[in-house]
Amino acid sequence: MPGMGHGPYMFRWEGEEIYTLIEKAHCTAYTEFGIPGVSPRSVLETFIPREELFPPKPGTSWEWHHAFGAWEADFGTWLCPNLLNDYWGEARSLDELIARSELLQSEGYKTIYEEARRQKPYCSMALNWCFNEPWPTAANNSIVAY
């Protein structure tokens, strides 16, 4: 359906920030977008052994709970360490990693929803894809955060 926001997919790794991508978009609906975030510490501690909590690494419980390798297009999904490191450098603690991830996620969603509202009445829908995992994950979790 022309004008619908599902595809073509747009990614920051293609060289443009969401702030400019969404402002230039002109869709009737944005039906699949997301900014994954790290799950709260209290959730992580229920399934990641203490010795694996920080730093997150592939091949550990982080990977088995979708922080790495959750999507074939980018092995860093859904933790997105390269994205977080581009903005802030390496996190020095789990709490710092979580705080940075939460900030990036909240600012990204704020930008998308505010711009979708500015595009009213042409744009009538904005539905994110994140927050719908059916089980406890390390990143890109359910809104209920188990």
Model-derived features: positions:
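Aromatic- and carboxylate-enriched substrate-binding clefts and catalytic-loop regions
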Residues: M1-W13
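Substrate-binding clefts and catalytic carboxylate motifs of secreted carbohydrate-active enzymes
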Residues: E14-Y146
